[in-house]
Structures are given as C-alpha cells and as structure tokens.
Amino acid sequence: MGSVAHLEEVRITVGVDTHRDEHVAVALDALGKKVATTSMPTTPKGYRDLLAWAEGLGAVEGWGVEGTGSYGAGLARHLKSAEHLVHEVIRPNRSVRRRKGKSDLVDAEAAARAVQAGVAAGVPKSGEGAVEMIRVLQIARSSAVKQHTQAINSMRGLIVTAPSELREALRGLSVPRVVAACCLLRPGELATPTAAVKFALRGLARRHRDLTEEIKALDAELAPLTLKAAPRLTRLFGVGIQVAGQLLVTAGDNPSRLHSEESFASLCGVSPVEASSGQTRRHRLNRGGDRQANAALHRIVIVRLRHDEETQRYMAKRTAEGKSKREVIRCLKRYVANEVYAALMTSADNPQKAA
C-alpha cells in the first residue's frame, strides 16, 4: 500500500513564453523540478488544450505568463475565465540569459520560477470592460492624430518649394483655409511640376480633411466612455478626456490590482528609486514606468501651474526653499498621482456613487 505522500496530488506552477502564433509552457512541481513541457497554438482550442494539459499534471497553483498585454492577452483572459490564478511576468533579466542562454523553454521555465519565488506578483489587466474599449479607440486616435500632423507638415513643405504663383496663393493662410483651398485644386494632366504639386497637395489636403472627421468621430465615442468609466477622475483640475483616458488605460479595467498609492506612482514612473549604498542614503529618478501615463501627469501639473492658485503658491514656496522648477514639478506629479489613484479606486469600488 502506498504511503500518504504518494497519494497527495502534485502541485504545479506553469510558466508560459508567449508568441504571436505559438505559446511554449513549462510545468514545475512544488520543489522546482521540471515536470513537463509543451507548446500550443494561439487559438481558442490551443488555450483549452494547454489548460487541460496543465490540469492533467496536477493541481495548478498558478500561472506565470509573459506579455499579458500583448501576445499573452488571450491566454490570460482564458485562464482567468477558468478561475485560475495568473501572474504577469516580465522577461528574464540579462544576467539570467547570459547564464542559461535564450530559448522559449528557458523563458517559460524562468516565468514559472518567478511565480514560485514571489517575484512575479503582478496581476494582469483584465481587458474585458470599458477601459479596454477606451484603449483600442485611443490606439486608433493616436494613429489618426499622427497622420493628421504628418499630412499638414508635408503640405507646408510642398508649399515652401512650390512654384511662385501657387506658393503666393497659399502663403499666410491658416491651416483650415490651406486645407480647403488645396482640396479644390485642379491639377489637370500631370505634364508640369506645378500640376504635380497641385495633385500632391490636393491628396494631402483630402487626407487631412478625412482624418479630421475621423478624430472627431473617435472623440465623440471616447468622451462618454471615459466619463462613465471614471466620473470622479474627469472632475479633477486639469484632467481632460484624453488625459483621463490614458490614466485609465494605464490602471486597467481592474485598478484594484494596484494595492497602494505607491504602486500606482511606480507604475507611472513618478516614485523615486532608492540608490543607497553603505552609509550613503539617496534616491534617484524613476526612469521606468508607463511613460505615457507619466506624460499625462505632467500635462495635469502644467495646466495647474498656469491656472490653479494653490499649485502656483506651492511652486513659489518650494522654489524659495532652493528647489528648481523641474524638481518641484516632480513633487507635484507625485501628488497628482495620489489624487488620480484615489479617484480611480472610488470609481472602481462604487461607480454609481462616484457618478
């Protein structure tokens, strides 16, 4: 008769290295011994097969998944829907790769070991609610805004080098008037440089006009989504729809995964990083975090410095103490991050009350 130890179910941890078309998984037992490896396609059936494979090995205590915001997003959602614990894992550091090399199996094993060691404690974004809708619309808007700017810049460049008659007709006009005028150009047969310039300007102007309408349409959808997702956030001084949307995307649909003001500040790159050694106690700037969220906080601070008397008094007080303007702005960004965190938590805990 087998002992009790032999009758106990094996407890395993699974690490997954994610890619566009295939995921590679490694399962470790509770002692860190490699139990099995596999690979599955990134399809719904592949996700089901991977989950069945893991459950067939024993009791799954947790999953370490790389790229839960990109290639691993679909798998993370599937595992969460099956009520499995998923941890977000960053790629192995350079020292690990120097020692063990780089392969999908090595990365998957490192992900599993990160979970067992408690290093991978991050909770992935759920990607299932209004914030995910805001995220995808913001991607489309950012692309449209970039092309919108490129179109008018290209038009200005062409106008500078255009034949004199055409250049003089368009010089000094505002952007809307330049676009309107260029949309009406008639190049005719492309037999001269002037005709070619007119043809190019008309195409760029029409592109600019179409992108303007596209941006307006996206803004019309983003505004109600953002206001509904975090009404208290949009009431903060200096927080507009675009800034609020970016901060929501950074926090995710499940901001409760951020356990404190400090964790949100670190995520936004506004928390100082300790750099002490021996008897020296010092901190350095945080160059990490979500730089788009950091930029959003910066915009809020700049607006408040221009229009909020309390912020202006704080700036005057700290500069009188010897702080530079840049140093004071860093302090203000941290204060704003705390306000944003409180607003996000209120909306997440009780959206009806926040509204």
What is each model feature region?
Residues 59-71:
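Short glycine-rich phosphate-binding loop at a beta-alpha junction
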Residues 47, 235, 241-325, 353-354:
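Phosphate-backbone recognition surface of nucleic-acid-processing proteins
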